């Protein structure tokens, strides 16, 4: 590895969505620093946190159509059957839902859980309840992607939370997307639900830490069974 590559790998990329926030924090820090050194250091800490929040690291995604990867960094908050949001047009039939909760320290860039064609993108206004609540999946503001994958229809739903009130999605309906490919971002704490056909076997447990684009959430063609339980 060259010296240039070593230096490059030492710095985590920052997503462009964070540039305005980082610039505002930096400018505010300089302004406050003119009046108080204490305020300057507090502003510097806030700016550093903002840089950390909008980090966009590269991820190593397993290349296998049977695998479903996590759409976000966070904690697995739910694994089990659930009816997908009505606006996705997937009917009133239960699918396997795996929820990933992101706190304010998580990387908030969202990635596709599978590869395929984006059949539909639907944004729905709503409330801003705590994203950890189960009813947040149907009552909160959200943005859903319906993906026609090689193993059936899969949906990824970005859900706003108490603090996160800005959902960003740059994917387009009708286009194709790869497993682990970036498609959006949610600012300042939120959740992403993945809805899968019941033929998919969950490979994670509630409470487990997930890494977006890398952690395998479920597998198609695996041995049938109930969702994993956490064993301490």
UniProtKB/Swiss-Prot annotation:
Protein's pathway: Phospholipid metabolism; phosphatidylethanolamine biosynthesis; phosphatidylethanolamine from CDP-diacylglycerol: step 2/2
Record flagged with keyword Disulfide bond: no
GO CC annotation terms, alphabetical: plasma membrane
Catalytic activity, as annotated: a 1,2-diacyl-sn-glycero-3-phospho-L-serine + H(+) = a 1,2-diacyl-sn-glycero-3-phosphoethanolamine + CO2
Membrane topology field: Peripheral membrane protein
InterPro entries, per the entry: PS_Dcarbxylase, PSD-A
GO molecular function: phosphatidylserine decarboxylase activity
PTM statement from Swiss-Prot or TrEMBL: Is synthesized initially as an inactive proenzyme. Formation of the active enzyme involves a self-maturation process in which the active site pyruvoyl group is generated from an internal serine residue via an autocatalytic post-translational modification. Two non-identical subunits are generated from the proenzyme in this reaction, and the pyruvate is formed at the N-terminus of the alpha chain, which is derived from the carboxyl end of the proenzyme.
Site-annotated residues for Cleavage (non-hydrolytic): 189-190
Entry's localization field: Cell membrane
Pfam families according to UniProt: PS_Dcarbxylase (PF02666)
Any Gene Ontology biological process: phosphatidylethanolamine biosynthetic process
Documented EC number(s): 4.1.1.65
UniProt modified residues of type Pyruvic acid (Ser): 190
Co-factor note (free text): Binds 1 pyruvoyl group covalently per subunit.
Keyword terms: Cell membrane, Decarboxylase, Lipid biosynthesis, Lipid metabolism, Lyase, Membrane, Phospholipid biosynthesis, Phospholipid metabolism, Pyruvate, Zymogen
Superkingdom in the source lineage: Bacteria
Active site: residue positions: 190 (schiff-base intermediate with substrate)
Cofactor: pyruvate
NCBIfam families in UniProt: PRK05305.1-1 (NF003677), PRK05305.1-2 (NF003678), PRK05305.1-3 (NF003679), PRK05305.2-5 (NF003685)
Membership in a protein family: Belongs to the phosphatidylserine decarboxylase family. PSD-A subfamily.
Subunit-structure text: Heterodimer of a large membrane-associated beta subunit and a small pyruvoyl-containing alpha subunit.
Biological role: Catalyzes the formation of phosphatidylethanolamine (PtdEtn) from phosphatidylserine (PtdSer).
Protein name: Phosphatidylserine decarboxylase proenzyme
């Amino acid at each position: 590895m060259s010296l240039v590559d070593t230096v490059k790998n030492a710095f985590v990329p920052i997503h462009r969505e964070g540039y305005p926030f980082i610039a505002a924090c930096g400018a505010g820090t300089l302004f406050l620093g003119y009046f108080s050194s204490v305020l300057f250091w507090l502003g510097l800490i806030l700016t550093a946190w903002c840089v950390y929040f909008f980090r966009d690291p590269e991820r190593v995604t397993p290349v296998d159509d049977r695998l479903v990867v996590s759409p976000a960094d966070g904690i697995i908050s739910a694994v089990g059957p659930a009816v997908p949001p009505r606006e996705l047009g997937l009917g009133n039939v239960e699918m396997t839902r795996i929820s990933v909760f992101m706190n304010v320290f998580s990387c908030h860039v969202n990635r596709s859980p599978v590869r395929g064609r984006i059949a539909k993108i639907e944004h729905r206004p709503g409330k801003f309840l705590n994203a950890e609540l189960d009813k947040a999946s149907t009552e909160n503001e959200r943005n859903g992607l319906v993906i026609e994958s090689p193993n059936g229809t899969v949906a990824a739903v970005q859900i706003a939370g108490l603090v996160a009130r800005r959902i960003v999605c740059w994917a387009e309906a009708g286009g194709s997307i790869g497993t682990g490919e970036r498609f959006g971002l949610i600012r300042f704490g939120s959740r992403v639900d993945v809805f899968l056909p019941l033929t998919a076997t969950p490979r994670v447990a509630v409470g487990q830490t997930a890494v977006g684009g890398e952690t395998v959430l479920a597998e198609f063609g695996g041995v049938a069974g109930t969702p994993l339980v956490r064993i301490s």
